[in-house]
Regions:
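Residue-level signature of mid-helix packing/kink "hotspots" within the transmembrane helices
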Residues: 84-92, 173-177
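Helix-to-loop junctions at the C-terminal end of transmembrane segments
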Residues: 90-103, 187-188
Length: 227
């Protein structure tokens, strides 16, 4: 497992260089004031994208579900291999698709994939349906992972993007922690079906929130154009 890490470091040291940047004056160290200067649109996008962490549980729950449907412990990691294989294959065309149908539309599609994955995993009683759910989860990851940071970069002012990224990492980390604790409690108290069913509901709630935000932005754009 350490070999890829060493190869990545070697590639960064020997094969990657920063592009030339114009000289800048002394810059102030980052502070909370930078986050407070973010506008409402940036805060809204950070909140919407961070809340997805409530619906997207840790991959450990996939492993436990695999054991629940009869996957032998020695083959349980195959689910993670499938997840990341689909993730990698799906992520490749996302850039081209985002230029055609828009980034927020792709994010909505990714949440549909996540809801479908949760439904499949909630209903799975055999390995075929389980692996279908894992593949759908991989599609969600492929369609959403790079988009989240891109959407925040688009929403934030250029001079405050670092603050926006840091705030997103903080909020999404806290939300993911809370979501995984809640998922664990649901699993212990009500079983895997309830856990993934709640995940499906949260995914759809996130999708509705983003769809509502898109409609509001479109209405504002039409209003500005008519003035």
């Amino acid at each position: 497992a350490s070999i890829p890490a060493f190869l990545a470091v070697a590639l960064l040291v020997g094969g990657v260089s920063d592009p030339p940047r114009p000289e800048e004056g002394a810059r102030k160290p980052p502070s909370l004031k930078g986050a407070l200067r973010l506008d409402a649109a940036t805060w809204t996008m950070i909140a919407l994208t961070a809340v997805i962490g409530l619906a997207r549980f840790s991959e450990s729950f996939l492993l436990m579900k695999g054991l629940d449907v009869g996957v032998p412990p020695a083959f349980a990691p195959a689910a993670i291999v499938l997840l990341h294989l689909v993730f990698g294959l799906a992520a490749f065309p996302v850039g081209a698709l985002s230029d055609r149908i828009g980034r927020t539309s792709l994010l909505l599609l990714s949440l549909v994939f996540l809801a479908a994955a949760d439904v499949a995993l909630a209903l799975a009683s055999d390995q075929v349906v389980f692996y279908l759910g894992v593949a759908l989860w991989g599609l969600h990851m492929g369609f959403s992972q790079g988009l989240l940071m891109t959407l925040i970069a688009d929403a934030a002012p250029a001079h405050l993007r670092g603050s926006a990224f840091g705030l997103f990492a903080l909020i999404s980390g806290l939300i993911a922690l809370a979501g995984n604790v809640a998922a664990g409690l649901l699993w212990d108290g009500f079983g895997p079906q309830a856990t993934f069913a709640v995940g499906a509901v949260l995914s759809l709630v996130c999708a509705l929130g983003i769809a509502g935000w898109m409609r509001l932005q479109a209405a504002r754009s039409r209003s500005s154009a008519s003035e």
